[in-house]
C-alpha cells in the first residue's frame, strides 16, 4: 500500500482479518528493522476499494478481531480528547463525529460478537464489529489525518503502546490493538473519565482484553522506565494538557485498585 499509493498506482485491499483499519486508511505505520516504531506515513488517498467478506473474517483466528476491538474504541477516545475545546476544520470535525461509531457498536455488541466469532459465526453482532474496526475507524482516520498530521488521530493510548514496543515481548507475543486497548484504560483514568473507564474495563474483562501489566507481560520496572518515555512520544505532542510521569503513575495505581476491588468482591 505504501509503495503503490506513493507511486500513484491503484491499490485494492482484501482484509481476511479484522485486527485494524489499515485496509481503508490513508496511512501506513512504519517501523524500524528492530521492530520499534518509526513514524506514520500519510498518503493523499486510501486504497481504491476494500473487499470485505465477513464470512471469511468470522472464521479467521479470533485473536485478531479481539485485538482490533481495542484499537477501534481507542479512536473515539483519542479523537475526542485530542480535539477538546478546539475550533476544528470541518473535515476534522467530521472525523471526530464519525469516531463515535468506533466506540458505540463495540460497547453494544462486543461481548456477544466476540462469542459468536469464537464459534465462526458471521452474526449481525460480528458484522457490526468488523465494519467498525475496518471501515468506520478507517474513514474516521482519513478525515482526522487530512492535514497529514497525527494530531487528532492518536493520543495517550497509542503513546503507551509505541513506548512499550521498546521491549521485544510486545512485538513478539502481543498485538497492537491488544496493548492499545489496555492503554485506553490508563488514558481514561488520566483524563478523569471514570464512567467511560468503567465501560471499557467491563468490555475488556468480558472479552479478556488486558486490564493489567501482567497480561501484556510487562514488569513493574519496565513500566517505570516507560513512564519516562511516554510523555515525549509524538502521539501526545498535540493534547489538551501535558502528560507527566506522575499522571501515568497515578493512573496505574487506580487501575490496580480497580482490579483489586473486583478480586475481593
Functional labels for PLM-detected ranges:
Residues 2-10, 189-192:
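Alpha-helix C-terminal capping segments
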Residues 5-99:
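A glycine/threonine-rich phosphate-anchoring loop and its flanking beta-alpha core
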Residues 61, 80-87, 143-145, 190-196, ...:
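Short helix-capping/linker segments at secondary-structure and domain boundaries
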Residues 73-77, 126-140, 184, 204, ...:
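Short alpha-helical scaffolding segments that buttress acidic/His motifs in well-ordered protein cores
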Residues 76, 80-84, 136, 167, ...:
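A short secondary-structure junction motif
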Residues 89-202:
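Active-site segments that bind and position negatively charged phosphate/pyrophosphate groups
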Residues 193-265:
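C-terminal charged capping/lid subdomain of soluble metabolic enzymes
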